Amino acid sequence: MILIDDIKYACMECVRGHRSSSCKHHERPLLQVRSKGRPGVYANGNPNHRVAIFAEEIAKSDKPSTNGTKRCKSEPIIVLKASSKQVIDCSSGVIIGPYDETKTKPSTVEKRTPSPPIISDESFINTSACCTPKISKGKSCGCCNNKRKAVNKSKILQNYIKNKLNQKINNNETLVFMNKSHTTNNEQKEDHQLYGMVPVPSCSIPGTCCCDDACSCQGCVVHGNSKYQIPLPTSKQQVTDTTNPFENEEKFIFNSMPQTDKSDLFFNTISTSSNVPPADSSSECSCPPNACDCTNCETHGILNGFRLDDYFKDQSKLMNVLDFNFSELLGTIPEQPIPTEFMQPPSENTLLTSLSSENSFIPNQTKELSTQPPILPLDAQNVCNELDQLEPLVPSLQPCDKKATKWVNNRDTLEDVSDNRVKSCCSKKTK
């Protein structure tokens, strides 16, 4: 082993043969033995360049050696006085020049320091729940929060239509459906009679009085109270004035809703007869107007998940709300006003059914416009029934073409289903 200034050196051959500890070749160029691992610094930045020195003399020891041969074999340590450091090329053995430590460059293959982790150590520390901000739940309305609560769908539809009608009245918007003039036998009719709800006082219809035997209602038909007699119409003008609540409307079927308190009578009657528990009016919906998620919302007019505004875009649907069908929401209904000749006054049974029905929320004045097929006159139906009874008796006679076309098309005009045409068909068959 060769030590120079307490640094281990060996010749090039011993370094390559991994015999640096037993090297004694001091007459050769001696290379500095590096520590294990990759070198941190290269001489002149070149991996083939190594720092080398040349031995000049052997330093003499002060004490004489005893058993020198045995000691050298066991501990072959030689201390030399070397020359200055030189740079030698290991591949060729050529001395490049003196070694300059300032020109030494660090190794490019030096291990890089590991980058800090993306997730810091503090993120794994458990924090207290009181320090972390809590997510505050937004305010929800009563109809969205409590799903088990019974919803009064009748009240939702009732308030929606009532608000729509009041809005139309306040904005002075009128809806006009003009009657088309129909001629029979090339003659123009002078007047078109309109049939609607007769404004009769309460308790004048059988089944509407809820009093006991001591009833004191004026004109009560149920308990036979005759203190008040309802005047009956005696002239054609009085009948027209009674059946037509819209006076001086110039032959319009519907012009505008009258601003009277009679329309509130049906809303009060329905609200008292309904068996559905009333909804909580104190809890108002806090959803945005255009993004309400409620299934049944009275504030925004939503019924069974459908917006009533989308259904009642057509004004004829709003007027025909008595025929409201929940299973056919957002459906299309033909917009065609019905001629006044096919409109008949409602009977008492029909009026009672509309009052007791759960889905009837609008005064019967709005039922003047109906999209159902037109109803034939009663006398025309009777005559046609008689014709059907005569067919088995006279098999040779063929039915009239006018009768066949009359029953195929339900939307024929009055000319095809008039009394005169039907009676003429009867006279032909009986001859």
Swiss-Prot record:
Keywords: Activator, Copper, DNA-binding, Metal-binding, Nucleus, Transcription, Transcription regulation, Zinc. GO terms for molecular function: copper ion binding; DNA-binding transcription activator activity; DNA-binding transcription factor activity; DNA-binding transcription factor activity, RNA polymerase II-specific; RNA polymerase II cis-regulatory region sequence-specific DNA binding. SMART domains: Copper-fist (SM01090), Cu_FIST (SM00412). InterPro entries: Copper_Homeo_Regul, Cu_fist_DNA-bd_dom, Cu_fist_DNA-bd_dom_sf. Residues 1-40 bind DNA. It comes from the Eukaryota. GO terms for biological process: alternative respiration; filamentous growth of a population of unicellular organisms; intracellular copper ion homeostasis; intracellular iron ion homeostasis; positive regulation of transcription by RNA polymerase II. The keyword Phosphoprotein does not apply. Its main location: nucleus. Signal peptide: none annotated. Zn(2+) binds at C11, C14, C23, H25. It is found in: Nucleus. The keyword DNA-binding applies. PANTHER family: TRANSCRIPTIONAL ACTIVATOR HAA1-RELATED. Copper ion-sensing transcription factor which activates transcription of the CTR1 copper transporter under low-copper conditions. Promotes filamentous and invasive growth. This is Metal-binding activator 1. It comes from Candida albicans (strain SC5314 / ATCC MYA-2876).
